[in-house]
């Protein structure tokens, strides 16, 4: 009986490493990579040979080589977002690194993109169908809190247009509006809160009207 094919790796389970040395393949199945290259490991079902991708090429790598001769990158998407490194971010997403993964602070890559003012990164993350806008980190801050606090009105506008919530409070009970450090951010947030408030009021009135008509 032939061995069943390995299960596909779920997004977010991809392991990412930076090669410390160049690896010269001995067979056509093996993956060539150079010192400093980023390697995405997608299949670790075989304990001896792992399947990986590097610079768009896929092949096998001895697992002991990766363990001993490569440096693990725990949150590559976060690192790319923090640095504003668009090409690396795209590469991570292409290699199925999970878009909503959390770092030790409980923050997403989107949070760090907003914190750093990297609008182009935010726009690419928004192309991911399941991107989580309202994830709160260990301090209770969302991506909207970060953008407002750092004063990036263009990013605040992007987040609001995408549907980010303005009513979430952090651990200090502060809304994104309370964190806004400039008038442009505050104005956008006030306007959105007023719109949301009016919509909530309208929904409540509709509900009461429906009850009256029963």
From Swiss-Prot:
It holds the Pfam family Ank_2. It comes from the Eukaryota. Its main location: cytoplasm. It is found in: Cytoplasm. GO terms for cellular component: cytoplasm. Residues 12-71 form the SH3 domain. SUPFAM superfamilies: Ankyrin repeat, SH3-domain. ANK repeats lie at residues 72-101, 105-135, 139-168. Keywords: Acetylation, ANK repeat, Cytoplasm, Phosphoprotein, Repeat, SH3 domain. The modification Phosphothreonine is found at residue 200. GO terms for molecular function: SH3 domain binding. The keyword ATP-binding does not apply. One of its GO terms (biological process) is signal transduction. InterPro entries: Ankyrin_rpt (IPR002110), Ankyrin_rpt-contain_sf (IPR036770), SH3-like_dom_sf (IPR036028), SH3_domain (IPR001452). PROSITE patterns: ANK_REP_REGION (PS50297), ANK_REPEAT (PS50088), SH3 (PS50002). The modification Phosphoserine is found at residues 202, 213. The modification N-acetylserine is found at residue 2. The keyword Cytoplasm applies. Interacts with SRC and SMN1. Interacts with FASLG. Induces bone resorption, acting probably through a signaling cascade which results in the secretion of factor(s) enhancing osteoclast formation and activity. The SH3 domain mediates interaction with SMN1. This is Osteoclast-stimulating factor 1. It comes from Rattus norvegicus (Rat).
